[in-house]
Structure formats: structure tokens, C-alpha cells
């Protein structure tokens, strides 16, 4: 993992902390992310796990960021209901969302305020969508069909 990738993952996970993202740790099971330490290690909880041959009971455990991957949904998997929620946040009649773009169709209002942008980002983080393209980079796991959230 390059420093640039590590920084991107760290920024993404910090924004997701209030929404309890589920993480894959190495080849262990899924755990809830509790916090990120100043040394860029992830703190996990809610599950006893085995890591590097050692057993850790259910408690707070720190792991290097390189071993942690969040479970996220690609934007292309957004349902019609979710798209409607995004339209309500932006106050737009019709929008189209793809991986990496937001296209506003048929709208008489051509501006988006920074408060709408912040609300939209919060919605994406809360619903565990991959808005930073971590999945194609191998920094996150596609949660489609896993029924993990």
C-alpha cells in the first residue's frame, strides 16, 4: 500500500467512523471499526478474532491499516429508493449517479450549495457507498449481496 493509498483510506475511514463501518481484517472475520489511532492503526471491537496466530478476546484491538479493508457498496448498486433520497437532498427532479459522477437532468435550479454537498457526502458515508473508488484500488471489499449491513 502506497502512502497516497494509505492517506486516502485513512481520510475515508475517519469520515465513516460515526456510521460504524464493518471491516475485514487480514483473513479474519468482519469487525466494527471503533477508532483510528494517531499511528494510523485501526481499533476494532465486538468480536473475538485470531490474528497472526494469536487469539484476541472481544475487546478493543489495534491493527496496522494495511491489514484493514472496509466493506462498501459501489455507486452503481444504488437502488431507485436510494436515488430518490439523493434527489431529495439536492432538491433536484432527476439525477443520474455513476462511479465518479453526478449528472443533474432537467432542473431549473443550476446551483448546489455547500450544505447540500455536505449532506450528500454524509448520506453516502452513512449508507456505506464507495465514493472514493476504494474498491477498484483493492482498498475496500464490495459488499454487494453480502447482507453485511
Locations of regions flagged by a protein language model:
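Structural boundary micro-motifs
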Residues: 1-149
